[in-house]
UniProtKB/Swiss-Prot annotation:
Keywords: Ribonucleoprotein, Ribosomal protein, RNA-binding, rRNA-binding. One of its GO terms (molecular function) is structural constituent of ribosome. PROSITE patterns: RIBOSOMAL_L20 (PS00937). It comes from Beutenbergia cavernae (strain ATCC BAA-8 / DSM 12333 / CCUG 43141 / JCM 11478 / NBRC 16432 / NCIMB 13614 / HKI 0122). The gene is rplT. Gene3D superfamilies: 6.10.160.10, Ribosomal protein L20. Residues 1-15 have a biased composition (Basic residues). Residues 1-20 are annotated as: Disordered. This is Large ribosomal subunit protein bL20. One of its GO terms (biological process) is translation. Coiled coil: none annotated.
Amino acid sequence: MARVKRAVNAQKKRRTTLERASGYRGQRSRLYRKAKEQVTHSLGYAYRDRRARKGDFRRLWIQRINAAARANGITYNRFIQGLKAAEVEVDRRMLAELAVSDPAAFTTLVELAKGALPEDVNAPAA
């Protein structure tokens, strides 16, 4: 059986790893072993944070909606409850965008939500 030489493959693997680590500081961008460790961790962080980003944005949208709703005299919880009662299907991303870019339209939605809420706070939603 012929002997398998892996020098080319090994060099390519090392070059690729060092290229991926090109922006890092110190030994992490120059020494293969350090670069390999850092690139492995970096890829793991990227994978994790791509998923975390979705929750981060949802929390940001909720904060923006809550701030705008409170400026209009209603809490976030009651606002969302009122929108559901009024059968308005606008997602939080669009509500946050309206709150920032078009406060008049957001105020209209707040009035709509207030009108759809039951009078008694403790009464179950119909």
